[in-house]
Amino acid sequence: MPIQVLPPQLANQIAAGEVVERPASVVKELVENSLDAGATRVDIDIERGGAKLIRIRDNGCGIKKEELALALARHATSKIASLDDLEAIISLGFRGEALASISSVSRLTLTSRTAEQAEAWQAYAEGRDMDVTVKPAAHPVGTTLEVLDLFYNTPARRKFMRTEKTEFNHIDEIIRRIALARFDVTFNLSHNGKLVRQYRAVAKDGQKERRLGAICGTPFLEQALAIEWQHGDLTLRGWVADPNHTTTALTEIQYCYVNGRMMRDRLINHAIRQACEDKLGADQQPAFVLYLEIDPHQVDVNVHPAKHEVRFHQSRLVHDFIYQGVLSVLQQQTETTLPLEEIAPAPRHVPENRIAAGRNHFAVPAEPTAAREPATPRYSGGASGGNGGRQSAGGWPHAQPGYQKQQGEVYRALLQTPTTSPAPEPVAPALDGHSQSFGRVLTIVGGDCALLEHAGTIQLLSLPVAERWLRQAQLTPGQSPVCAQPLLIPLRLKVSADEKDALQQAQSLLGELGIEFQSDAQHVTIRAVPLPLRQQNLQILIPELIGYLAQQTTFATVNIAQWIARNVQSEHPQWSMAQAISLLADVERLCPQLVKAPPGGLLQPVDLHSAMNALKHE
């Protein structure tokens, strides 16, 4: 066969083999084009897992009529124009292959309008030579791309497509990843005419955790440690889950972004894994959502056609920077300082995201105020990342006024010879997770009871009862109100006059519990609930709570928290060993009084002596 130039359609189909792997690949390329066009809202409509229809609609800047034909041509792009642009890419797309490749293996229609145009125009390519036809259309400012019958002309590729559910799950994962990268854009994902995902745009940093919880789930949000780390031109932001409380489900959450581009990079994963290796088991993986910002000239994006990988010009520097950033946050978790009564406590800094995920900031036993103050983190020179390193996860002690003077006074006091004085009274040791424990979980009995071994005795513990006590502790406000979590879609309910009066009387108490609402003539709108209620069926629970309040003459936060704890649905109809161990660890940490004096219905000793005596008499 002689050497010949391939027809345009065949050449595009060959390129599609690298770019268009499955429907999710199409969604990724088209949504990234929408983001590059400055869209603030992107609607994704899918039918039959993307095999029948993929429609991407955005409100971006649109494409001019005279550029529509070029948009469907190979190697035509508005992102780069020279080698200098290629070496400093800031856009998501730049190859100019996506639309041409997709149109060669599907029936693609491109409709767009710019703000300067009075009407929209529609373009589509067909035939062996991929000739583009342009005609007038009706469309608002922005762009809509419809991809029909993906792989209709490449049967071999269509055979490799999975089930409709599997393909849509891949699309759902792609939208999750993109939504985590662009908090300022609204994403709506529909499948077979039904809205499946809606991620609303958030503007403020404090609201980013709202989307983080919606995408990654409440368990990750509860254990998330915020990171803000910088050195020179490198910046690392995001969240990493506390390795001490990382579960198997959380290990699937591993998202990293380089200059806003989602990546699967071994170097980044290795740096994070190395920082967490002392706290992770051999079969555990870290969970994280991290954003690395670097000078575009220091990273090569033009490595893989699908742009999943990058190369760093100073890979060792990037690796060590990420390692130090993650390690510093984890070290701050475990470091404590020597309590010195001579030093006045520094002003408390309560970050937006909890520094010590899972630490009890709800109800705590009565103790001196100084004991409840969290220890100020110590500066660790080995995790500084150089003089340019900084960290916003907590206030540094040397940043407080008069710190150096206080340290000098303490140092001189330590050097003085103590005078003879009576021996101090013994102080009871602080309660920690090792000194007080329910014991070791041996097995699960009956699906909802844990068989425990502690100090040579066997006991049976009711897991639903333990979970109820944990929920009550999480819902009971301590020194500060329970943190309210805004609902993505507020719950609007119709209430009677008595119920409305009861809500108004208990509004301040409900606010302390993290339940925020607004009321009008005959309705109440629930806008926020505490974190333990985010996964509950609020359309059932909240009306029952309102009915309970309407029957009460007096209100107390303890009683309301107790009622909610008794009426929430358990997250585990059938308990596993891992779930039981995690629950008991939380109960031991948040409800230490239950370990000392277990209430009725929680713990039941198992009489092994009677059984042993019966066996001896056989």
Curated annotation (Swiss-Prot):
Source organism superkingdom: Bacteria
Entry keyword Lipid metabolism: no
Residue ranges of the region described as Disordered: 367-403
Molecular-function annotations in GO: ATP binding; ATP hydrolysis activity; ATP-dependent DNA damage sensor activity; mismatched DNA binding
Transmembrane segments: none
Gene3D superfamilies xrefs: 3.30.230.10, Histidine kinase-like ATPase, C-terminal domain, MutL, C-terminal domain, dimerisation subdomain, MutL, C-terminal domain, regulatory subdomain
Pfam hit, one: MutL_C
Amino acid composition bias (Gly residues), ranges on this chain: 382-392
CDD domains: HATPase_MutL-MLH-PMS-like, MutL_Trans_MutL
UniProt keyword list: DNA damage, DNA repair
Compositionally skewed regions (Low complexity) per UniProt: 367-381
GO-annotated biological processes: mismatch repair
GO cellular component, one term: mismatch repair complex
Keyword Cell inner membrane among UniProt keywords: no
Stated family: Belongs to the DNA mismatch repair MutL/HexB family.
PANTHER family in alphabetical order: DNA MISMATCH REPAIR PROTEIN MLH, PMS, MUTL, DNA MISMATCH REPAIR PROTEIN MLH1
HAMAP family xrefs: DNA_mis_repair
Protein name (record): DNA mismatch repair protein MutL
Organism of provenance: Salmonella newport (strain SL254)
